[in-house]
Amino acid sequence: MNGIMLVGSAIIIFFLAYRLYGRWLLKTWGFDPNAKTPAYKYEDGQDFTPASKFTVFSHQFTSITGAGPVTGPIIAAMYGWLPAFLWIIFGGIFFGAVQDFTALYASIKNQGKSMGMLIEQYIGKTGRRLFLLFCWLFSLLVIAAFGDIVANTFNGFASDGTLVTPNAAAASISMLFIFVAIAFGIFTKKVKPSEKLRFIIGIILLILMLAIGIAYPIYLDRMSWLYIVFAYIFIAAVMPMWILKQPRDYLSAFLLLAMILGGVIGVLAVNPTINMPAFVGFSVGGKDLFPILFITIACGAVSGFHSLVSSGTSSKTLSNEKDSLFVGYGSMLVESVLGVVSLVIVCSAATGGHLPEGTPFQIFSTAVAGFFSMFGLPHDIANCIMTMCVSALALTTLDAVARIGRMSFQELFTVDNPEEMSTVQKICTNKYFSTIITLVFGYLLCLGGYMNIWPLFGAANQLLSALVLISLAVFLKTTGRKGFMLYIPMTVMFCVTLTALVESIYGIFVKLSAGQFVFAVDGLQLILAIALMVLAISVAVHCGKELIGVKDASKAELNN
């Protein structure tokens, strides 16, 4: 087996899936290209801000494409390339893309409501509160994990004190991104340039930022960057979308798409041989293929976090209902392509059936930088650009989840009549207070390091997907739309994630019995794991009762 066959077949399959299955879903559920979307109906200059199709796509794509499609397939390759490849293909088409698209579709059909508010409308207030609490706890895990990843990526010093220029240059470019994005956002808002002019200006700005950042790297240690990153995501979470988040995502999309394109072209040019067996075994290193494979490869196949982006932010900026397929379904398939490229890279770098040493980011960055070097780009510059791309993956996810965590906390205390709100509720629904409380808890978790959080994050992420799928199935049924395509994915995800959480809890108790239990790490994980499991089962019971008991189209009109 070689790289061209895997990447080429994946691209063809994803293209056909978008054209056939994706369009069939949109046609089956119905859309109105002339309807006013929530972005126009409730435009407030803050969260509801109409944007072009590619702008919304760039926001969706850069927000959902975190570290997962790089790290997941590389780690899961220990079972062989075939299980990982099949899960990315089938998971991406029938699980992840369907979930992301349906969440976006349901939201734009319901005043741009987030998943929590949708659950209240179709399932009830209790289900909504439980789901929002789950989402908020999940947001803390994401903030902690990705905050630590970004701070480590920007760390300009090695353990022995030597300077790490690629990291420092990537940090410098990222800081430039923030200020340039604000200026670009104001320019776009005031001048309203054509898409062609906007594209040209975006490319020029990107090249200038890369050149300046590489020439003037910023050397700071991990803790300094941790403070800066959390200060940035506070600002990003409270500022209007059009000022910072949208333009930053638009510019970041060029980087990420170039990275994927570079990886694809590199694979096509080199046609690397796959040096890993197709299948290694059902258990490797004491880790069972089920459920570990399906937890490890999340963002490349299906990720519950994506639904929060679809319903929490993208639905509030979409200008036309027909674009929901391109944004929701299309962005997930592009991310799946990145997952396949990552898988090919690690399997081609294997020797004697053993994976290469190093972190997934190091393996991926080194390989793709090598591809860029083949086209005449100096290796140092290529390595710096790849480090920047990898950090952009995590940083765009980080500022998106900070906003989503803030909104989830606010919605927990929101009531139907604002005049009936107590003083505590008014404080908790304040966007500044809710952002601060979210980031404080995220920061405390972050101090333990992302490796202590990642296993729980993976299980919680996929469990969120199961909850979202069953909630969306209720929406489809109550509005008279076909929802059978969600039944198998939601069942599979529940089985996978509950099994993984039970194994995690069991593993912590084994540590406790062996005297290796550390409360600051294991105790916190145990509390969160049990809380997430109880909340998930409670939400699933509420949704299940509604799904079984409700009659078709009993709660809403088909084309609401």
How would you label these PLM feature ranges?
Residues I13-V70, A253, I292:
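Membrane-interface "cap" regions at the ends of multi-pass membrane proteins
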Residues A67-I74, G91-I93, Q99, A103, ...:
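Membrane-helix boundary/coupling elements in multi-pass transport proteins
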Residues R23-T49, I75, F85, I89, ...:
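Flexible loop linkers connecting adjacent transmembrane helices
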